[in-house]
Structure formats: structure tokens, C-alpha cells
Regions:
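Long, low-complexity, charge-biased intrinsically disordered regions
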Residues: 1-228
Length: 228
């Protein structure tokens, strides 16, 4: 970790880059608000609140130059209770098989297809949470007169079921656009239009695209972006 990267919220206030970190925290809270991910909640005696943690990171470009200060509010998944806060049978993230990616590359090379990569920003926050999950207020979010906790409405990073929820959400989006999901690897999706073909292999919130038509990917990429 970078020496100026805080490991907890309290260290931010003493950090030489305090203002930059506070700006990153504000950006994260704004993103959570836009996604309607959290809602103020009055804790009651039957609630079993989990805890959240701020995670900080200084991001760099591939050439090593500075990119940005990043703050993310994550759930401490280990504080969740199986069967209550999540279904233990629905926690596997959508991770494509290594053989799927290797085959996709081999087919693309043989057919002279074009390759693209993508990542979905804030992917998990787009997936709704089915379970009733509440949490204690983390540093940076103040209590109100009527609330001393938070109701979690979306799949926060760190929740045991978030990766699974996002995978289900993204698969539904792709199938609504006409993609066919592979029965061999559910992280592989294929789209056909006339003589053109486009294949997507997903790895959680990242993906690789191989297509005979870059224009087709441009079109579908915009449609995916409009839905997600």
C-alpha cells in the first residue's frame, strides 16, 4: 500500500492529502445516493446490524503516473449471518472459466475477429438486495433524529451475495438484448445478427468481447450502458 493511503477513516483527518481523501469520500457517498443503495433506518431490537468499512486506494495509470484518490464504502461480509443476511447457495460471483477465455482468444485469432475489453463502473450497486440487511452507521454518515442505522437496498461491495446478484443482473440485461447464454459456461454470451457474431466472456464486472463487427459492439455497448 502507498504510504499516504489511510487504513481507516480516522487516519484521513491527519493525512497530508486530507482534502483529496475527503473529496473521494464525498464522491463515493454521492454514488451511493444516486444508486439509492442505502436508506436511513431506526434500529430495533430484532435487527442484527452488520458493519461497514471505508477502503482507500491511490490509483495509478498503467505507466505509473498518478490517476486518482479512491474511497469505497464496503460491507464487512464476515459479519453477515448465513440464512438470514444471505442465501449460502447464492454467493458465487460470475467468473468465466480460464478455458472459456482461451478458447475465445483462439477463435478470434482464427476468424480474425476484433477484441475489446470493458468494465462496468459501480456494477454491484446496480443489483438490488433481496434480503433485509441493516448496518450500523459508518464514519462519514451522520445519524438523524429518526435513525441510527442504515437499511442496505443494493448489493454493496463486500456483501457475501453481491457478486452473485450482479452476475444475475448482467445476464438478464444481456439476454434482454438478444444474447444467448452458454450452457457450458454461464459467463459466455453470444449474439448473432445476419453474418455478424459477437461473443462476451465475463469476469465479475469485467469482460472480454470478440466480434466480427466493431460497429455491432459499438451499438450493443451503448444499449448495455443505457440499461446498466
Amino acid at each position: 500500500a502507498h504510504k499516504y493511503t489511510p487504513t481507516r477513516y480516522s487516519q484521513v483527518l491527519k493525512n497530508p492529502y486530507r482534502d483529496n481523501w475527503l473529496e473521494a469520500i464525498t464522491a463515493e457517498l454521492n454514488a451511493l445516493n444516486r444508486a439509492n443503495a442505502l436508506k436511513h433506518h431506526k434500529l430495533i431490537h430484532t435487527d442484527r446490524p452488520i458493519t461497514l468499512k471505508w477502503v482507500f486506494r491511490i490509483k495509478f495509470h498503467a505507466d505509473g503516473t498518478f490517476h486518482k484518490f479512491k474511497a469505497r464504502l464496503c460491507a464487512r461480509g464476515f459479519t453477515q449471518k448465513a440464512g438470514t443476511d444471505y442465501d449460502p447457495d447464492r454467493i458465487s460471483a460470475s467468473v468465466g472459466r480460464a478455458s472459456t477465455f482461451m478458447t475465445l482468444l483462439a477463435v478470434a485469432a482464427h476468424e480474425r475477429h476484433h477484441l475489446f475489453g470493458f468494465d462496468v463502473k459501480g456494477a454491484y450497486l446496480q443489483a438490488k438486495l433481496k434480503e433485509h440487511v441493516v448496518c450500523r452507521l459508518p464514519p462519514g454518515i451522520l445519524a438523524t433524529k429518526d435513525s441510527d442505522g442504515l437499511l442496505v437496498l443494493k448489493s454493496l461491495y463486500g456483501l457475501r451475495q453481491s457478486g452473485y446478484n450482479w452476475g444475475q443482473k448482467f445476464a438478464k440485461v444481456l439476454k434482454s438484448l438478444g444474447f444467448h447464454q452458454s450452457r457450458v459456461d454461464p459467463c459466455l454470451f453470444t449474439f448473432h445478427r445476419n453474418t455478424d457474431v459477437l461473443r462476451i466472456a465475463t469476469w465479475v464486472d469485467d469482460g472480454m468481447v470478440a466480434t466480427s463487427s466493431p460497429a455491432l459492439w459499438d451499438e450493443l455497448r451503448l444499449k448495455i450502458h443505457a440499461i446498466t
